[in-house]
C-alpha cells in the first residue's frame, strides 16, 4: 500500500513537471513566432542542445537565423558556428565567415577570434595577416586566451607586423 501511494505521488509530480515544461516551451514558441529575437535565440539554443526538446539542428538553424537577421549578436555567432561545423547545414566557410563578421562587428569576442583565424589561414575569405592581427587584437584585449596566443605567434613570426619578440612574449604570457 505504501509503495502504491508513493508511486501515485511520483506520477502526479512527474505529470505536473511535464505539463509545466510543455507550457514553457509553448510560451517560448509563441513569442518566437511573434518575432521576439530573444525568444527565437533561446528556442534555437534549446533545439541545438536538446534542452527540454528533442535535439534538432534544422530547427535550431531556422530560429538562429530568424534571430540573427534581427541583429542578435549571439545568434549570429551561433549561426556562424553551425556553418563552420556543418551542424544541420552543409559546411560553408564563406557563410560562416559572413555570420562571424556580423557578430564580431557587434563585439562578440569568440566571433572576433574566429575572424582572426579565418583571415590568418584564408578560410572562407582571402588570407590577410593585417586583418587577422586586427581581430586577434580585438579579442585578445578582452581576455580571449586563444587570441592572445595566436597574437603572440603573429608577432613572433613577423606576420602583418614587424617581428617583435617583446610583444610576442607579452601575448604569450597572457595566452597561457
What does each model-identified segment do?
Residues 20-51, 66:
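N-terminal segments that cap or nucleate solenoid repeat domains
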Amino acid at each position: 500500500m505504501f509503495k502504491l501511494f508513493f508511486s501515485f505521488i511520483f506520477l502526479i509530480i512527474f505529470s505536473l513537471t511535464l505539463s509545466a515544461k510543455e507550457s514553457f516551451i509553448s510560451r517560448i514558441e509563441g513569442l518566437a513566432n511573434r518575432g521576439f529575437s530573444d525568444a527565437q535565440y533561446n528556442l534555437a539554443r534549446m533545439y541545438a542542445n536538446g534542452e527540454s526538446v528533442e535535439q534538432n539542428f534544422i530547427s535550431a538553424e531556422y530560429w538562429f537565423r530568424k534571430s540573427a537577421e534581427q541583429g542578435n549578436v549571439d545568434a549570429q555567432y551561433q549561426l556562424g558556428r553551425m556553418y563552420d561545423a556543418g551542424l544541420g547545414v552543409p559546411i560553408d566557410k564563406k557563410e560562416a565567415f559572413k555570420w562571424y563578421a556580423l557578430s564580431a562587428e557587434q563585439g562578440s569576442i569568440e566571433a572576433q577570434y574566429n575572424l582572426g583565424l579565418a583571415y590568418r589561414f584564408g578560410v572562407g575569405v582571402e588570407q590577410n595577416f593585417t586583418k587577422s592581427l586586427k581581430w586577434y587584437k580585438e579579442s585578445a584585449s578582452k581576455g580571449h586566451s586563444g587570441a592572445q596566443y595566436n597574437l603572440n605567434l603573429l608577432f613572433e613570426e613577423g606576420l602583418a607586423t614587424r617581428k617583435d619578440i617583446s610583444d610576442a612574449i607579452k601575448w604569450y604570457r597572457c595566452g597561457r
